[in-house]
Amino acid sequence: MLPAVSRARFVVCEDGSEYIDRFRRFLGEAFEFVAANDLAAAEAAATTAHGLLFDLDFRRTPSDRLVDERGATVVAPDEGTRRRLVESQGILILRALRARGVGLPAMLFADLDDATQAGFLERTLAPLVVAPSRMGLREIGAWLEGLARGTLT
């Protein structure tokens, strides 16, 4: 009997299931995808992962599970604060993970209007790739494969 082949494991951090459903459907034979819908779940899942995949916007996340720029939960934020936090929650979770010593390669799915902002994020939260919506599954799969083989960081 042949030993079971383990697949590279990636944490998908989002407030719904759109990304993880798509990845499991189209890339699931090659990779294992684990859901994480907040900082605590992402940190726990990261311990056995090859990389992290982030949505940017977390509109469906309850306020008591959002983190701010310091990685702290915000108790009953006002509407303006909540809007600001949900619109950048993927970045804030990744920033908190980096501050806690999680150095796994990450991909952030975001259409940023400013290339300078994308470059800043990629430098300050490295290793990070900011992936615009035009990036297809083939490109995403190739990046994941590179991480799994150890040829990318």
Enumerate the predicted regions with their spans:
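Structural motif
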Residues: 13-17, 56, 111, 133-135
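Conserved acidic residues
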Residues: 50, 127-128
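Short acidic-hydrophobic, aromatic-tinged amphipathic segments that line or gate anion-handling sites
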Residues: 34-37, 128-138
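A short, hydrophobic beta-strand element within the central beta-sheet of small alpha/beta folds
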Residues: 74-99, 103-122
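Conserved acidic segment of CheY-like receiver
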Residues: 6-18, 23-27, 35
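Acidic, metal-coordinating helix/loop segments flanking the phosphotransfer/catalytic sites
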Residues: 17, 35-51, 58-67, 73-79
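C-terminal output helix
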Residues: 116-124, 133-152
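A short acidic (Asp/Glu
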Residues: 21-24, 63-66, 117-121
